[in-house]
């Protein structure tokens, strides 16, 4: 699993308003999803992450990209052509 692609996919889905979002939607393990979301929050790419049972949750309302997160999407724009929708995400992040 490519961590950078997973992080990009999570940012892209939040940006597109495709929340709520979970590991089941992306096809990764709970730990992989939690690690990616925690990284994105800790490094200042996203805000509005809710926590329950010591896990991050990306609900319909709340998660937003910061300016840093938006810049990450722009800087990795070449991935945008390869990644179009959440339907393709499971194969794309491998």
From Swiss-Prot:
Domain of life of the source: Bacteria
Pfam families, per database record: YjcQ
Induction: Expression is sigma D-dependent.
SUPFAM superfamilies per UniProt: Winged helix' DNA-binding domain (SSF46785)
InterPro entries: Phage_Tuc2009_YjcQ, WH-like_DNA-bd_sf, WH_DNA-bd_sf
Protein name as it appears in the record: Uncharacterized protein YjcQ
Native species: Bacillus subtilis (strain 168)
């Amino acid at each position: 699993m490519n961590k950078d692609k997973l992080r990009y996919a999570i940012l892209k889905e939040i940006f597109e308003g495709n929340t709520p979002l979970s590991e089941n939607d992306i096809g990764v393990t709970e730990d992989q999803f939690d690690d990616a979301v925690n990284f994105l929050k800790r490094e200042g790419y996203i805000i509005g992450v809710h926590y329950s049972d010591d896990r991050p949750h990306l609900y319909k309302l709340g998660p937003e990209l910061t300016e840093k997160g938006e810049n990450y999407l722009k800087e990795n724009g070449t991935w945008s052509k390869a990644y179009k929708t959440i339907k393709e995400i499971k194969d794309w992040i491998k």
